[in-house]
C-alpha cells in the first residue's frame, strides 16, 4: 500500500466528512447555539426587567407606606382635635350645669330665708300679742295699757310691712 494514496484517501474522506458535517450537522448546531444564545439573552433581559420592576415596586411600596403614615398621623391629629373639642364642650356644659345648680341653690336659700323671716315675724307678733295680753291683764291703769298696746301694734306693723 502506498502511503500517499492512503493519505490522499484519508484526506478525501476527511473533506467528505467535513463537507457532510458542514452541510447537515453544522447548521443544526449553529441554530441550537443561536437559540440558546437568544434564550440566555432573553433571560438576562427578563432578569434586568424583573430587577427594574422590583425597584419600582419597592419605591411604590415605600411611597404607599409614607402615604399611609401621613394618613395615620392626620387621623390621629383629627382624633386629638375632636377629643379636645369634646372635652371643651363637656367643660362648658359642666360649668353651665354647675352655675344652674348654684343659682337654683341660691334661689332655694332665698326662698327659705323669706319663709323663715315670715315665720319669725309671725312668732314675734304672737309673742308680742301674748305679752300685751298679760300686761293688760295685770295692769291697773288702762291709759298706760292702751299706750303700750298701740306701740306694740305699730311695731308689729313695721315688722310686717
UniProtKB/Swiss-Prot annotation:
Name of this protein: ATP synthase subunit b
Keywords: ATP synthesis, Cell membrane, CF(0), Hydrogen ion transport, Ion transport, Membrane, Transmembrane, Transmembrane helix, Transport
Keyword match Aminoacyl-tRNA synthetase: no
Main localization (coarse): membrane
InterPro entries, A to Z: ATP_synth_B-like_membr_sf, ATP_synth_b/b'su_bac/chlpt, ATP_synth_F0_bsu_bac, ATP_synthase_B_chain
Membrane topology listed for this record: Single-pass membrane protein
Organism, scientific name: Wigglesworthia glossinidia brevipalpis
HAMAP family per UniProt: ATP_synth_b_bprime (MF_01398)
Cellular location(s): Cell membrane
PANTHER family reported for this sequence: ATP SYNTHASE SUBUNIT B, ATP SYNTHASE SUBUNIT B', CHLOROPLASTIC
One Pfam family in the UniProt entry: ATP-synt_B
Quaternary structure and partners: F-type ATPases have 2 components, F(1) - the catalytic core - and F(0) - the membrane proton channel. F(1) has five subunits: alpha(3), beta(3), gamma(1), delta(1), epsilon(1). F(0) has three main subunits: a(1), b(2) and c(10-14). The alpha and beta chains form an alternating ring which encloses part of the gamma chain. F(1) is attached to F(0) by a central stalk formed by the gamma and epsilon chains, while a peripheral stalk is formed by the delta and b chains.
Any one GO molecular function term: proton-transporting ATP synthase activity, rotational mechanism
Protein family according to the UniProt entry: Belongs to the ATPase B chain family.
Keyword flag Ion transport: yes
Record function comment: F(1)F(0) ATP synthase produces ATP from ADP in the presence of a proton or sodium gradient. F-type ATPases consist of two structural domains, F(1) containing the extramembraneous catalytic core and F(0) containing the membrane proton channel, linked together by a central stalk and a peripheral stalk. During catalysis, ATP synthesis in the catalytic domain of F(1) is coupled via a rotary mechanism of the central stalk subunits to proton translocation.
Transmembrane segments: 12-32
Amino acid at each position: 500500500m502506498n502511503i500517499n494514496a492512503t493519505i490522499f484517501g484519508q484526506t478525501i474522506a476527511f473533506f467528505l466528512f467535513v463537507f457532510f458535517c458542514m452541510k447537515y450537522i453544522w447548521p443544526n448546531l449553529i441554530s441550537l447555539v443561536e437559540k440558546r444564545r437568544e434564550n440566555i439573552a432573553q433571560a438576562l433581559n427578563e432578569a434586568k426587567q424583573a430587577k427594574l420592576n422590583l425597584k419600582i415596586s419597592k419605591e411604590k411600596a415605600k411611597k404607599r407606606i409614607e402615604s399611609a403614615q401621613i394618613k395615620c398621623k392626620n387621623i390621629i391629629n383629627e382624633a386629638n382635635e375632636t377629643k379636645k373639642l369634646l372635652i371643651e364642650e363637656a367643660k362648658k356644659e359642666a360649668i353651665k350645669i354647675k352655675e344652674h345648680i348654684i343659682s337654683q341653690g341660691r334661689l332655694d336659700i332665698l326662698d327659705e330665708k323669706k319663709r323663715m323671716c315670715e315665720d319669725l315675724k309671725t312668732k314675734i307678733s304672737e309673742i308680742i300679742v301674748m305679752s300685751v295680753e298679760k300686761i293688760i291683764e295685770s295692769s291697773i291703769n288702762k291709759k298706760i295699757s292702751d299706750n303700750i298696746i298701740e306701740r306694740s301694734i305699730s311695731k308689729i306693723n313695721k315688722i310686717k310691712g
